[in-house]
Amino acid sequence: MASSLMVPRAAGGTLRVVYEDIQASSGGGGVPVLLVHGFASSRRTNWVVPGWYRSFAAAGRRVIAFDHRGHGESEASHAAADYDEGLLAADCAAVLDACDVREADVFGYSMGAMVTIRLLLDHPSRVRRAVLGGLGANYLTPSPLKDSVPEALLAADPSTITDPGARGFRVFADAQKQDRVALAACWRRPRTTAGAAALATIRAPVLVICGETDAITGSPEPLAKLIPGAEARIVPRRDHMTAVGDRVTKDAVLAFLDA
């Protein structure tokens, strides 16, 4: 059953964030895993539908997952400042606090992987091991979709969207029945991409994993090389949307977190 907590807005006030804490059915004492979903997605779309809840349950893991502010069942804001990645990382820590968990393994996908990097930097004691899924070389460079995605999300007529990448985000957001104004604000959030010096301070073991044909993220190796001891994996013949639930991804993630 889902629960909720209140998290701070940038300029005062709070937003309601919905989360789930699913105890391992086997009663196993393994480290809990916190799942951090991607942009325009939700805990259900990113983790339940691809079978991650089942996979972690079979591994005896306690699963903690939540909907980012502005996504899924969580409360939305239309102010970009409310989606600052420092706030999103603090939400992760707040969810762990609500579940009385001091330290967890963390698996973030796409935007969730960006937030996981910020969690590793701002709250390092909360992360035992981390998986950065659907994130790679393109994290290190400005997104070519910086302006086109929010424009596509706010377009009155989707048929007028000419950028194929931006159109894909609009189609996905519509399929999820998300608040597109909130998503546009989230995309325009204040971003502080961690540079080489910051990434070099990460001490937790990290796995960077991407689909072979993922044009959104690029190759995992350039990002992994900047994080001390990080591993890089490529999921053959998979793109940004299909890599997340692939068997190769699941085997690699479960093996890494159990190491």
Outline where the language-model segments fall.
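Conserved HGGG/HGGXW glycine-rich cap/lid loop of the alpha/beta-hydrolase fold
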Residues: 15-75
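Catalytic histidine-centered segment of alpha/beta-hydrolase-like enzymes
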Residues: 238-250
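Hydrophobic, aromatic-rich cap/lid helix
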Residues: 170-195
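Short beta-strand/loop motif that positions the catalytic acidic residue
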Residues: 202, 208-210
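Conserved alpha/beta-hydrolase "acid-adjacent" motif
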Residues: 215-220
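N-terminal cap/lid segment of alpha/beta-hydrolase-fold proteins
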Residues: 1-17
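Conserved acidic catalytic loop of the alpha/beta-hydrolase fold
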Residues: 86-104
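Flexible "cap/lid" loop of the alpha/beta hydrolase fold
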Residues: 114-157
